[in-house]
Amino acid sequence: MIADRSKDYELQLLATEKFPVWEANGAEGRLLEEAVARTGGPLFWPDERNGWASVFLRMGDQLMDRARSPARSGDERASLYETAILYFGIARLPATETPVKREAYGRQKAAFSEARDVFPFDVRQELIPLGDKDIVGNYYEPRQEKEITRPEAVLLTGGADVTKEDMHFIASRIVRDGMACLAIDMPGTGESEWKLQPPGVSAVYPRAIKYLAGRGDDPNRIGMMGTGFGGYWSLACAATCPELSAVVNCGGPVHRAFSHESLKKLPAYYRLALSSAMGHDPADFEKAIGLLGDYSLLRTVDLRRIAVPVLSINGTDDPIVPIEDLFIVAEEGGVRQEEWEFRGDSHCAPRHYGEWMPRAVDWMANKIGGQERVPRPDLAKL
């Protein structure tokens, strides 16, 4: 197991960067704190009986039992299923390198499938052909009896340590805003049959965008939203996919994050996630470093081709993606973007997740559906 950083450091990083988002999505802070105190975290002995993966797997199972009770209302069952999906995802992160983590991901997918009937919107699995493989996506659609035209559509993707099921909480906000949403795994994560490769090599995202455009959704009303490495792909696709009308980039690496100096400083958690996504031995991050240097968006795409609205978000104290990468999009790429920087916050601004996430979704709705799509007087530059 990767252990070049102390266990205490890794657990503190987890508490700082992940706990605020998990709590906002329904996790109990007390249980998270107890898990940190009792386990070695997701990197150290996670499969032992009282290890991280095993503990959260049991929590998810308990919630599933409660969610299946016919005595509960539909809203109660939906909430319990969502929290089970959350806990199974926590058990799995940041990669499926152990048997219990792989089991946790299997249960997360099963929980998501079982919960579809109780969600207040339609969700179905989509298989998008690409070569001899399929892109697996979760397609969300609002239930709007009076809707005459198909809704706006958003392609949603996460980073190296999350799955499309983990992105359910953002997807549910998107669909509640009246938009359709296709959530897919970043290559190298979840059910993706591809490994992480630079733009120009990977055709996964352009294919998913064309699929959305071809479903009958207005090709002039398609957006893309990504968190972490998913933000990287939002920017790359904005420069290369003419179907997109707006993109949101939250915490995406752009250029300086791919420097040798920055990559060498990455915590073990992210080393494991990136190595796994690229198909390398998780214990040998040096191979990944040698390749990641070629991912800079200043080298792989022409950012000057971006002509759609861009919203970039991050915390100023991000230890994973230097805050300079948020500004370099405009300074070096010449992109006119809105910038939401949260002072003192970390990677993807987790302490302000409850603020930026719904606002960013509303921003997207207004950009691809019209300024009055979701009236929000507070949608102003921070």
Residue ranges of model-derived segments:
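Short beta-strand element of the alpha/beta-hydrolase
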Residues: 148-159
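Short beta-strand/loop motif that positions the catalytic acidic residue
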Residues: 306-307, 312-314, 318
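Alpha/beta-hydrolase active-site loop
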Residues: 166, 173, 195-220
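Catalytic histidine neighborhood in serine/cysteine hydrolases
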Residues: 331-348
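N-terminal cap/lid segment of alpha/beta-hydrolase-fold proteins
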Residues: 55-56, 60, 97-149
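Conserved alpha/beta-hydrolase "acid-adjacent" motif
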Residues: 319-325
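Hydrolase active-site cap/lid region
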Residues: 236-291, 308
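Catalytic histidine-centered segment of alpha/beta-hydrolase-like enzymes
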Residues: 344-357, 375-377
